[in-house]
């Protein structure tokens, strides 16, 4: 498979990600590709179609469809990655600041922390239901483990404690 256009370039990169076992990342690239193809209305997208004006129009298209700024950013960064690889290989023209006019940052409006009084009441609450007590204990442990992700907590085993020290590998990053 050649990378003669953006679609082929992205499909090849998605294939490599899957071979490397990076399935979530591959899905993210596939979602970006599907979205950009819908926007373009094309099955083959020449690299020259990726220009400042079309990227601005694509951003407006995504926002009009109700996508969040973080989705816009993710899709733009996925397209930029593959486009930059094509530039390095001489398959796409180098355009200075090509992605400057579109959002590629991270927007965080939502607060992710519990207020201290709510956390304290959850950690000290008394529950009659044994399942709720177990859940509260898990919450307390995850908090005491400095905000350990639930997926990491769920994969813990007795063998993870060595010499009084908890050792584990992150599920997300290995």
Language model segments and positions:
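Basic/aromatic-enriched alpha-helical hairpins
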Residues: 1-65
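Short, leucine-enriched amphipathic alpha-helices that occur as contiguous helical runs
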Residues: 29, 75, 132-136
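Surface-exposed alpha-helical interface segments used for non-catalytic interactions
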Residues: 53-56, 77, 120
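Basic, Lys/Arg- and aromatic-enriched nucleic-acid-binding interface segment
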Residues: 97-150, 154
